[in-house]
Amino acid sequence: MKKSNYKEELIDKIKMLAQSNGLNTVFTTFLEITATSIAAQMDPQNAEEREQRYQEIAAKMTPETLSSYARMFALLTLATREHIEDPCDILGDVYHQLRLNNEWNGQFFTPDHICRLMAQMINVDMPPDKEGPITISEPTCGSGTMVIGAAWAMQRKGIDYRRKSFFVAQDIDIRCVWMAYIQLSLYGIPAVVIHGNTLTMETWSHWYTPCAAVPFMEESVEKGA
């Protein structure tokens, strides 16, 4: 089936909005407002804080600008849905196509095919006697591409990563944290994405994807019953 142009439409939308605000500002704002909107609805541990931050960002925008960011989120959601059986790093590709690496201290994210190869070399298998999920750590997650590659490899092995895995991803750059959090959320990957310094062990915030937040939701419901 022919793929649509959702990713290209997203890039065009970012460029259009960037005419008056700059590419880096628009892309960074898109990441933050999207990440906080997801977390405000789906992460009960941090919902109040995320909702407050979302409202602070939205209050500074015109209705037209806010609508543009909502459309960008919709386009990203549609793009990830097309790849739900073949997960890939959409935001990382958008970042590179926008040539933002010069403004992000020269950061480059590992291409999908390399991440998939590395994930296959790790050869993740579900032990027959293991009841809990496979836990995988990614200490420098970037846009989440290695986690997405691992999910892809698990899926090819017939392992349901939505039910049989849990990822702990971390990055020192909050923009990378948002990128990873958004994509892992949209792909239904259970994970906590940590804004922190892997070397010094400092942590500043935790972002639980909707699939990871479900146990906390169930616990809240049980307490309220």
Task: Give the location of each predicted region.
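Conserved S-adenosyl-L-methionine
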Residues: 112-212
